[in-house]
Amino acid sequence: MNHSPQSARPVSIMRRFLDSEAAGGITLMAAAALALIVANSPFAQTYFDALHLYIGPLSLAHWINDALMAIFFLLVGLEIKREMLDGQLASWPNRMLPGIAAAGGVILPAIIFAVLNHDNPAKLRGWAVPSATDIAFALGVLSLLGSRAPSSLKVFLATLAILDDLAAVVIIAIFYTAEISMPYLGAAFITAAVLFVMNRMGVVKLLPYLISAVILWFFVFNSGVHATVAGVVAALMIPLKPAPGRPDDMTSPLHKLEHALAKPVAFIVVPIFGFANAGISFKGLEASVLGDTLTLGILLGLFLGKQFGVFGAAWLAIKTGLAEKPMGASWVQLYGVAILCGIGFTMSIFIGLLSFPSDLMQTETKIGVLSGSALSAICGYLLLRAARPDQSAANPLWKADESPEAKNFGRFLCVFHFASYIASTYCTERLQAASSLLRRSSLEFALPGLLKRLIPRRFRAVETEIPVVRLHGAIMTGGTSLRPTLSLASTAGILEKAFADKHAPAVAISINSPGGAPVQSRLIYRRIRDLAVEHQKKVFVFVEDVAASGGYMIALAGDEIIADPSSIVGSIGVVSASFGFPELLKKIGVERRVYTAGSNKVTLDPFQPEKAEDIERLKALQLEIHATFIDMVKERRAGKLGDNPDLFSGLFWTGTTAASLGLIDGLGDMRSFLRKTYGDKVKLKLIQPQRGLLGRKLPGIGMDSGSVEPAQIAAHLGDGLLCVAEEKAIWARYGL
């Protein structure tokens, strides 16, 4: 049967793709991307339920991580043995540069992670997560550069990654072993001994080795040592020498098994692992997870620790004469490859799953690994694409002013930051959040200030940092993102966040409120005082335009109250306001029917004429609330209040007069006051409302719920207009 060239072409294209160096990395990236999409799609629940589906004694996720990945580690072990005995690592001179660089790439990321998490033993278990390099992913990115990257760099990266994997295997075997079962461990040693004896006796048939490897996996799995170690041990026992009478080394059991496993592992095993473990649901995740020390430790360990550890160790080895620089590679290209070593994906996620049983910590681990790996892949690729080969053996390490590749990389950073600022100005709220997050991240990677923070606090001079909370708006429930208001529901989160800063000696609260609901005012006041006592912090309140009525009640939570000379302060009283429509229904021909059980259930009905007894009852309630307000002022301002008879009459004053009456402690502004109190180097840190991982505002300052949908806006438009009118009326009492 004849085939046309057209019908044969798709097959040849697929074959070329599968044979390319980048194929494994591209497939893994696609699997990870697909997992993220599915985990945040309508099929998310099905995806997670499937992973927790039990097949025999284990869930599907455990079969993938404990059994399927043993095949991956079997291939890793085969590659390590072949390279050590008959490859790039067969001689000590060839081992020196990648070996020293790999050591630096394991040690420095672990140190960065440990420094950030030294005070949390549970998180510290993940110290090895950022120490691994994903060989398929890293080589896949490097191969995308084609001839731009010298072959010596590819050999260097492959060799370094193999040594990295060897270190990871040793770390897993030593540090991530559960409670040991000695009978099963003994059986595992006996099985390994059988494999060793078969090797020494010259057995070259693969089947006995594979059967023994499965038995070894079973015993190791039940011993408490992680089952994937069985794959490496079995690989080390498989003969590298060919069968007698077969001089071709490629006929050896090791070569045949390695060749048979290469494509299934690259295109089936590893992508399945990536798909099963890269799925992160962003629903309900807060942006604060990006600032968690666990996430940061992994992200910075991979992105900064790897590149500085690998490149620094390689530079020292080359400069001291212990090793030679890869032929034809420039220093910038070597640095680019060091950045690519921060692609940790497969092995990093695997170690993370061993380190943390908690779902939240595993999610933070995956976010850190994905973020650090993505940054390393993008920056490493861009730098290598801009770099040029070594022109001279005597080329100095860095000539920033003359190096074309450095200039190109600088241009890239400038364009990136300019684009992100444009996005922050013109894009939607969600894109603004993502853009500013990326911009801040790239700046922090570039600035030495972040590196300074990696040093333990007791070993560095730390500037005093004061959290600042801004409370702005009328005090009432029911606010939205379109009409922000103050209530306990809207302020509790941001207040908790401000007082949680254990290094801050105080919290500064900037208030600009004309008052509103007395209950919400007192609840906010009470929450501030409770947090101040709980965290043993001073509270400084700074008045902007106005702190009147309920706004002043909140201000009483401060140990000191500072206002501008022109601020409006006071209005210690109670006011109730509503509308009356006693004739409206009659004029429009509507009859209102009200049925009650209880003679006072229609008190202050706006559709009925005012009643004297209703007004009297309301006045009594107001007097009780007023008395509570007065007691609060006298308690918090004890020994400071003046004798003005109008102090509690509801009048309000400028900041200058309020200071003379003892309602505030002084005049000034926040920055000047705090600099005078804590020194010129004090820093103010504005506490922002929390956002979800994708930039959506979470319930917080100025609103009781999340974002408002168009249907909600339409449904509550009338109510919203009345509330806006009421709020405007409150501000208008003070000429604002």
UniProtKB/Swiss-Prot annotation:
In the N-terminal section; belongs to the NhaA Na(+)/H(+) (TC 2.A.33) antiporter family. It comes from the Bacteria. GO terms for molecular function: peptidase activity; sodium:proton antiporter activity. The chain crosses the membrane at residues 23-43, 58-78, 96-116, 126-146, 155-175, 178-198, 201-221, 224-244, 265-285, 298-318, 334-354, 367-387. Its main location: membrane. Residues 1-387 are annotated as: Na(+)/H(+) antiporter NhaA. The lineage of its organism: Bacteria, Pseudomonadati, Pseudomonadota, Alphaproteobacteria, Hyphomicrobiales. This is Na(+)/H(+) antiporter NhaA. One of its GO terms (cellular component) is plasma membrane. It is found in: Cell inner membrane. Signal peptide: none annotated. Keywords: Antiport, Cell inner membrane, Cell membrane, Ion transport, Membrane, Sodium, Sodium transport, Transmembrane, Transmembrane helix, Transport.
